[in-house]
Amino acid sequence: MAIVKRGARSKAKQEAPAKSGIKKAEFDLHKKKEVGVSDLTLLSKISDDSINDNLHKRFMNNTIYTYIGHVLISVNPFQDLGIYTKEYLNMYKGKNRLEVPPHVFAIAESMYYHLKSYGESQCVIISGESGAGKTEAAKQIMQYIANVSVDDKVSTTSEITQIKDMVLATNPLLESFGCAKTLRNNNSSRHGKYLEIYFNPSNYQPVAAHITNYLLEKQRVVSQITNERNFHIFYQLTKSCPPEYKQSFGLQGPETYVYTSAAKCIDVEGINDGKDFAETLQAMNTIGLSKAEQDNIFRSLASILWIGNISFVENEDGNAAIRDDTVTTFVAYLLEVDANVLKKSILERVIETSHGMRRGSTYHVPLNIVQATASRDALAKGIYNYLFDWIVERVNISLRGRAEAMEKKTIGILDIYGFEIFEHNSFEQICINYVNEKLQQIFIQLTLKAEQDEYVQEQIKWTPIDYFNNKVVCDLIEATRPQPGLFAALNDSIKTAHADSDAADQVFAQRLSMVGANNRHFEDRKGKFIIKHYAGDVVYDVAGMTDKNKDAMLRDLLEMLSTSQNTFVNSVLFPPDLLAVLTDKKKRPETASDKIKKSANLLVDTLSQCQPSYIRTIKPNQTKRPKEYDNAQVLHQVKYLGLKENVRIRRAGFAYRTTFDKFVQRFYLLSPKTGYAGDYIWNGDDISAVREILKSCHIPDTEFQMGTSKVFIKTPETLFAMEDMRDKYWHNMAARIQRAWRRYVKRKEDAARLIQNAWKVKKHGNQFEQLRDYGNGLLQGRKERRRMSMLGSRAFMGDYLGCNYSSGFGRFVLNQVGLNEHVVFSGKGEILLSKFGRSSKRLPRIFVLGRSSLYIIAENLVERRLQLSKEFVIPINSINYVGLSTFQDNWLAVSLHSPTPTTPDVLINLDFKTELVTHLKKLNPGLTIKIGPTIEYQKKPGKFHTVKFVRSDVSTIPIHGDVYKSGTVSVRPGLSPDSQNPKRPRATSSKVDYSKYYNRGGRLAPARTVPPAHPTSQQRTPVAPPSHATQQQPSYPTPVAPVHQQPNNHVRKVPPPAPSLNNNHQEAVTAATAAMNHVNIQQPATVVQNHNSNPTAPSRPAKKAAPAPPVKKTAPPPPPSLSAAKPKWPTFKANYDYDGSVSGSMALSANDIVYITQNNGQWSLAKSLDESKEGWVPTAYISECPPPSNLGGSKSPPPPPPPSATTRTVPEQGGNAAAAASTQQEGGLSNGLAGALLAKKNEETNLAGSIADALKKRSATRDSDDEEEDDDDDW
């Protein structure tokens, strides 16, 4: 991850600069774990089964929404998932579709955004079978648009607020009058509606609305299938009407009326009719229906219910007669007509004959029971149908507002009945399925057309996809020429036999053979016919179709209603012109098929003028139970909805596409050149930013195409990888913040602990050093000391294995052997173990000293696993004495008062023997310490053994060890027995640069390498290496400011650091930042100058100037001989090997020659001859020696030849540097390959030194402010 330079950290929060509409990235708190794929175009395998499987996975995870591009797939959950709350609504407000999970709110937000941004009217087409959730989806879209368009924070007029409330109130009102409980759905829409919301073009707030009604199912008023219900309003009214209505309209419970009880379903689980009736009344009041209008509505509903209770008996002539005249009398009271006129209109039919233009005779023909029942039901259906139409028109009057005087920008919501297949299908089903065929046709056409237009507009190559065009089925139903369709055949049958319904049905059955001729989507059967719809094959019954197609009330009934004294009946519901249409013999009345055909075509024209959105709803089961998923049923819906073809069309070459700005908004975090700390920093245009992001993610060119305004991603796996990288970015940033915070807290704790320890040492002294001095006093003048024991940093810490910690190896040891006491001392060493018949052997052991006993623990491998066991347990009070030699060896004998075979004397070899003896003495003050040339102990109880110690300088003896053989220990000479530990040396800085451990979160990137620097005419000279804090600084030339590469103009630069009073600090910050940025920088060059010239810093590279005229110059004098150079510091030779294990020290091998720059007694500051390493070494290990003969180089190179008169010279400013470069180049060639390698090594070493020096300077300056935290995280 590249590090961008920035100034010193300020406590004042700095706002990120705004950039071209790209918002600062935010972590999505609401994002759920993805189950399946959220867009079906991202499926690896495209098939009906894979689509069904993906929908199943998401449904079981309560994720009911899935995309196909911009099409939303919704699976009805049959339960409240809590995903339509105010919190969810705000989550989708103003968000791009890619930023949030699939939801119906995302479709609504997209519609409203395009309306505002492009001024295009929008519509949403919601399709699916009955019970799939179309009405609920329409309600949620209305709820969302009403809320986002009327923002609470923006001042709105009372009229706009009223329009919003009325639009929302249409839902409960029309649901009560237009929805019913069916076998498949408890709230099935038995009509279609298209709601258009009109918006003000200036602020896009709703100012009006309009509802178009389609094909109410009138037949449901008079009859329902068993276990279904009539329209909701009848049950609401009969269960919850106020007492005044019960008294005035004679209303009783729903079980009283035939129309509400015949299907044997009065109550429905999950429906509260009383509560719904209260919402219906509230909706009426919101829309503006007056009390008189409401009374007339409920009076009409009561009359329909009582009409259904009119029953018939057969009289003496075999004609129908009223069974109970009180019922017809009460119906006449409700309709405010004469009771005899009502009975006559139901029981008789008036027939007029004509003779040409002359009026004929009039006949009153009595009806039988079947005919009278049909007349009764026709009256009830007619009243309800015209009442529903009037309610819709009355709502439109209230919603009209100011729409007529303004430019119309609308959002349309289509909620229409779904495809229906029943056991017996009649005229209602063919009309419903015809409308769904038209919607499927416009869906295919608009989807494919939009897809084709997009590829052409974006200049993207793609392959056309074959699909089923259902226009042939639509023509089968609606066509008039050249071959008439079903609707035309129905109308012709009515015209041929208008007086007899049975005869008209027979004529229609005969004409079916002509309708379906040569059409493979039609089959004619006796009394039935089959149409192969896109959703499946449906069998329709011929019987009754022609009668239902007439869609007109009998003239007798209309004439009876025109006599009503109620103006709502005779003028509003049944105006006089309605009767005039029936009496006009020159014009054929409009049939139901004519109306539905006209409405469907007008709907298609309206939708074609809008920018469409689509919601395809799916019903998961027939039992309406949550968490139940019928695979076969859903698979059938997936097939007939054409989801696979929709996916194939959408994925015609590319699985994902979006505009450049949205792509950048989503993924700019993935490139260090476009995103920094969550901010967008790219200065170029969006298309170049897209290319940079794809390049940083290493997406090959074959995986994407760039259009004119969109980027197209070919495979879903590419998008998945980028989304995964984006998710990891947030996790890595969170982890980085956590690390930085933990590091900050740890540093504070360490600093506090350091201050506390320093205060304790200052006040009470260092207890570990005091213990060390006490132990040294026990051996003072009696035993030679090892050099490592006399270090100033040596302290008696005791628990070297960490047994007192809660974890680690020491705790593991205690747990293995079952110890649970405080440990005073722990360490690893050896014991001398005697074997029968063989010489003694040194074996490794672990020593743990508690407050009461010394534990010797053995390590054994059992079945390749480490096992620890207590070998000896020696009570401290049982120790008689401890024996040590007078030499610098590590042997220690522990002799007991009464040794036993299980607890014998032991001979121990331990590096920290003096510390162990000290702790034993502290725990047992009466302990005797014997020091002599020999050590005596009992190998076995009663059998003493003596070990002799001799001093030897044989090279085979280790410097820091000894040799045991046959009871004799040979050891090298040690320090004087009177040696004292020096004062503890001052600790060196241990700051760490953490930035090198960071990698940008989630970005796929190869290992970064530093590119080679561009050649320069100046000779590169490394910056001086860092010096120790206590070392006197030598005088060096001031380094020249580095020259950077030309920056990328597209990347926005973070503001440079503020000017500092310390120039050296500023140079250090610049060098360190450039080093961490991995940019190409010119190494600072040593300026070779005359004694009368001043050094000048180079400026930015200027344009190339014309070459100067040739000037003849003499050759420069040869440089001084390198062999004559004197060393900067005295040279010393190492007499012994030193491992450099102490912090801040430097490792040495015997005979190494180093510089010594400082000596404080026991320790000396050493530096290697090439000045690449520096550290402390024991003064006792080194001795002064003359410098080596090859120090500083070998034979001086010969002077270069003088330049030719024709040779061009460089400008005067760089002339000396060029000469020096030439000199060094020739010298390097003369020295051969070894010299070149050595020069390369020195250059790398000095470069590292310059970076380290710069980092130290920057850290020192920052540490001067205690309030500031080190900036060691690169964002």
From Swiss-Prot:
Keyword Repeat included in the entry's annotation: yes
Subcellular localization, as worded in the UniProt entry: Cytoplasm, Cytoskeleton, Actin patch
GO cellular component: actin cortical patch; cell tip; myosin complex; plasma membrane
Residues spanning the membrane: none
Compositional bias per record (Low complexity), positions renumbered to this chain: 1095-1106
Domain SH3: 1127-1187
Cross-referenced SMART domains: MYSc, SH3
GO annotation, biological process: actin cortical patch localization; actin filament organization; endocytosis
Residue ranges constituting the Myosin motor domain according to the UniProt record: 35-727
Domain IQ, first and last residues per copy: 731-751, 752-777
Domain of life: Eukaryota
Binding residues annotated for ATP, in chain numbering: G128, E129, S130, G131, A132, G133, K134, T135
Stretches for region Actin-binding: 410-493
Job of this protein: Type-I myosin implicated in the organization of the actin cytoskeleton. Required for proper actin cytoskeleton polarization. At the cell cortex, assembles in patch-like structures together with proteins from the actin-polymerizing machinery and promotes actin assembly. Functions as actin nucleation-promoting factor (NPF) for the Arp2/3 complex.
Family stated for the protein in its record: Belongs to the TRAFAC class myosin-kinesin ATPase superfamily. Myosin family.
Domain notes per entry: The myosin motor domain displays actin-stimulated ATPase activity and generates a mechanochemical force. The tail domain participates in molecular interactions that specify the role of the motor domain. It is composed of several tail homology (TH) domains, namely a putative phospholipid-binding myosin tail domain (also named TH1), an Ala- and Pro-rich domain (TH2), followed by an SH3 domain and a C-terminal acidic domain (TH3).
Protein name in UniProt: Myosin-1
